[in-house]
């Protein structure tokens, strides 16, 4: 699945496009408002990015810590959904632990999620967040709850 900056979707490889099953349009979500873009997705790894704009900055001009957390959670959740949706399941963030190492003021924040565990009710992802120079700025450990869909 690939989400372009305008929220449209394309399926990559054998992963399903599940956008039509969401009850809220991408443009109306936090992800769409701030411009998260999924760049690549496989069942074991996914990447995404967001352009640094004033919407993402806190009052000191740095990317807000919550933006890193939200990008990591979106990426880990969407990567999980891409696999479990066809099995009648949905995925939502269960826990998000993010540590910060380096501030970002401009450019992009780029995220890479690597799947560590895929259980029947919980998936776990490690997410690295980097600046345009490839420097590690934050890491997130994401637990994703997998539950039956109610659609």
Curated annotation (Swiss-Prot):
CDD domains the record matches: PaaI_thioesterase
Where does this protein come from, organism-wise?
A: Arthrobacter sp
List the catalytic residues: 73
* Keyword annotations: Hydrolase, Plasmid
Q: What's one Pfam family here?
A: 4HBT
- Assigned EC number: 3.1.2.23
The molecule here is called: 4-hydroxybenzoyl-CoA thioesterase
By sequence similarity, the record places it as follows: Belongs to the thioesterase PaaI family.
